[in-house]
Amino acid sequence: MTTDTRESAKVAIVTGAGHPDGIGAASAKALRDQGYEVITFDLEGADHAVDVTDAQQVATAVQAVAADFGHLDALVNNAGVGVGSANLLEQTSEDLDLTLAVNVKGLVNCCQAAIPHMLQTGGGAIVNVASLCGLRALPAIPHAYTASKFAVVGLTKSMALEFGPNHIRINAVCPGSVDTQMRSKAISLLAEQEGISLEDAEALETSTISLGSAATPSEVAAVVAFLCSENAAQITGAAIPVDGGMTGGF
């Protein structure tokens, strides 16, 4: 790729994109399919090894991307964890601290590093990967995870108000059941909590989905890519469910 092409192509950073079967990797692919130059961050398996809880690591990596391409147009905050017990009395301080550090502090670190570059070039788009658990509480989900995703939705809305005048659009996607490792863990927790088999737990969870099946990472990624695109030019501060109708009656 020539220098001129690098400088003219839109550039996106996607965090939490190291797992090949996750929403982050799918989002990176969807953005590349739209013509973006995409740089991925994760602890391993990504273009840059970055711990999003470390503000200096994040700032250094974002600066390197902006310096390499000359600008930054989009940020997808996908890095997240869901750890610990769904029983409040069994939740440890370590699990709470890690969940909030990655899911909330990590997101803020990335936004604080990326937004100054967007301000310099007159705008950009940020998509925060929240969760259906950021819109409503669900059974068999660690309380710290639910709290962190409500925080992501709140941050999305408040940051959208602050940076809208600067033409930086900030939205959240709220996936419901997605066919990832995190879903498998949630089904295991549900089975344990209800005292049922994994097969019955999966059937119970699937029964709450109006469309009858869990989403694929690529289906969530399609919404992420849309929100980064000019087709979403008038959308900011939104928290969009991608849940197969799980919130249909909510």
Name these PLM-found stretches.
Residues 2, 82-85, 136, 213, ...:
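Short C-terminal tail/terminal secondary-structure segment
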Residues 3-38:
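Canonical Rossmann dinucleotide-binding motif of NAD(H)/NADP(H)-dependent dehydrogenases/reductases
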Residues 86-88, 95-98, 126, 205:
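Substrate-binding pocket helix/loop in short-chain dehydrogenase/reductase
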Residues 111, 148, 156:
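Active-site helix of classical SDR
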Residues 116, 161-162, 233:
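Alpha-helical segment proximal to the catalytic Tyr-Lys
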Residues 164, 169, 235-237:
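Short, small/polar-rich loop/turn modules that mediate ligand/substrate recognition or access, typified
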